[in-house]
Amino acid sequence: MRIPSISKLVFYWIPAAAMLVGYPFIGYDIIAGGFEIHGDQLISMQFLEGTYLYIIHHLLSFIPVFFFGIVLNWFDYRNAVWKELLVPLVMMALIFIAWDILFTALGVWRFNPAYIQGVSIINLPWEEVCWFFIIPFCSLFVYQIVKIRWSNPWGSARTLQFVLLVVLFGMYLLNMDRIYSATSLSMTISMIGLSLIVNWKGFGLFIASFLLLLIPMGLFNGMLTGLLTKEALVQYNSAEFGGIRILSFPIEDIGFGFGFLIGILLLSDFIKHRLSADYTLTK
């Protein structure tokens, strides 16, 4: 990983990312209402109908990873969490919690009171705040498995990065009138662009692990969007996303998760290399 100068980040990447993310908001009014209450239900699971749905979701995702990854330290995940991932995970979680707070306040999405406990932290259900720490912790276990088992598939995958940038930017231009679509795409574009700037060698590894991660994502995200319940826990404003769902969740959620996870890994590598460089300079 090449460590970019602060000036390069300040004068190039940060303004470009800010423009991509912020431009759709200029002079744009969120269309109120129009929430999609029902998801595309695949099967009804009665035990999920109630205010403990989000808690059940967290327990089902967290307990296996905690047991195998932390208690048994499979694939050296315990060391990876404490030494490399914990600090960047918390930092990125705070950024995405702010995004969640903003979009909830704007009416881009809302939370069904029938499936949450009713206790809020900064206008978010406390279960939602926990999501930003539990789910990346679980998701990065998949990344760690691929990292150990499959030695960096596709390398830096620069060609794939450029192709994704072109395709996603075209989609961004077509969806600038939908706030969630535009923001999800712009966040993904910004993170891929940053991985190019820093010449991150782990992009291919991340893509391989993210593709595998889409399998459990379908189930666990589906639990929150009406795949297994009569109504969705997270209800989206139909005017602010493209209307395409995978199982029961909007395709934009993939960009949300992509940006969140790759941001953690980029920040982790940046901190590791910056500390290493500082240590070398002071020896």
Residue ranges and their predicted role:
Residues 2-283:
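Aromatic-rich, lipid-facing transmembrane alpha helices and their immediate juxtamembrane interface loops
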